[in-house]
């Protein structure tokens, strides 16, 4: 008895959100998720490697590479960005600032965003530069409450400066390896707050730490007159599709490009981010630049295991 791969038809969410007729569909394997990927900003070799890392079938990779060629050609014709034009303004509403201060006073937020290192601002979505090349269309469409009003960007404050939502995770212990594994669907799950304490002189040392996702804040570092999106991709996309032109966020000043949060290999290069026409956030919703690619759901795993070894005295 042979099994058949179950597939479902997934509508391009960008068309459905815009109220347009979805004339094209791609069969996506059941259990996979549709992402918008800015493949046109990759070189051909890097784009193919990126797609192959997603375990896609060769024929789909070839099809997506053809779409990447169209996107790359389109990018060459786009006008450069104007870094002299202001893309942000201070957020001055007293009630909004009080809510932001309350959230940012949380210990996890103070650790990630120390007081005095950021300001609350409204940044124009059209001029935000993404540093990562993809986002989950289905997840983005699920965010936000019914009280979001595009005519009033302050209605998005609670979404963009959010309380940390409970994150489900699984813990397993490997006693033979003296290891603990923590896994969950949140991609920002990490070790925070590492501490130690010695109970008595020459007594045992007690180590403690927390495993937690990063603060749920839309963060936009500013460097060389450009605004880069460090976190909050799905919320910004949701707001953009609802008609918001500006997003409330925590803006920090970066002295070097690496300070904007460029960690991980699946990010745009410095040459792309500082190009005359870098990626812009609305590109994710563009029918040529934002190429729909199926991704397998990923789990974040944090493994804690002590290294025990001898060193010469």
Segments and roles (model prediction):
Residues 233, 242-244, 253-255:
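A short beta-strand motif that forms part of the nucleic acid-binding face
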Residues 2-25, 29-30, 34-36, 40-43:
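Mixed-charge, low-complexity intrinsically disordered regions
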Residues 110-226:
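Short alpha-helix boundary/capping and kink motifs at helix termini
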Residues 26-163:
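N-terminal extension/subdomain marker
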Residues 224-241:
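A sequence-level detector for short glycine-anchored, His/Arg-bearing signature motifs
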Residues 228, 247-251:
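Short hydrophobic alpha-helical runs that function as membrane-insertion/retention elements
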Residues 300-313:
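C-terminal catalytic or substrate-handling cores of phosphate/nucleotide-
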Residues 250-296:
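Accessory, usually C-terminal, subdomains that scaffold auxiliary metal cofactors
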């Amino acid at each position: 008895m042979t099994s058949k791969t179950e597939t479902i038809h997934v509508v391009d969410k960008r068309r459905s959100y815009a109220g347009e007729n979805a004339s094209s569909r791609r069969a996506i394997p059941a259990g996979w998720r549709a992402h918008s990927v800015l493949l046109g900003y990759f070189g051909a070799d890097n784009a193919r490697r990126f797609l192959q890392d997603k375990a896609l079938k060769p024929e789909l990779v070839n099809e997506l590479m053809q779409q990447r060629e169209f996107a790359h050609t389109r990018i060459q014709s786009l006008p450069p960005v104007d870094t002299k034009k202001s893309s942000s303004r201070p957020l001055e509403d007293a009630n909004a600032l009080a809510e932001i201060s309350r959230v940012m006073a949380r210990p996890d937020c103070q650790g990630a965003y120390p007081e005095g290192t950021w300001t609350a601002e409204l940044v124009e979505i059209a001029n935000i530069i993404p540093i990562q090349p993809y986002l989950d269309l289905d997840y983005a469409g699920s965010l936000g409450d019914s009280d979001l009003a595009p005519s009033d960007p302050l209605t998005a404050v609670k979404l963009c400066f959010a309380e940390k939502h409970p994150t489900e995770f699984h813990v397993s212990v490997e006693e033979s390896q003296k290891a603990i594994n923590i896994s969950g669907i949140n991609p920002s799950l990490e070790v925070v707050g590492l501490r130690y304490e010695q109970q008595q002189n020459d007594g045992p040392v007690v180590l403690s730490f927390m495993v937690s996702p990063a603060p749920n804040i839309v963060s936009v570092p500013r460097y060389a007159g450009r605004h880069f999106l460090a976190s909050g991709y799905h919320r910004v996309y949701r707001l953009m599709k609802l008609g918001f032109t500006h997003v409330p966020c925590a803006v920090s000043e970066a002295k070097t490009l690496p300070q904007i949060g460029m960690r991980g290999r699946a990010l745009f290069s410095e040459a792309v981010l500082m190009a005359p026409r870098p990626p812009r956030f609305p590109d994710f919703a563009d029918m040529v630049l934002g190429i729909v690619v199926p991704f397998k759901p990923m789990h974040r795993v944090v493994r804690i295991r002590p290294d025990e070894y001898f060193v010469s005295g």
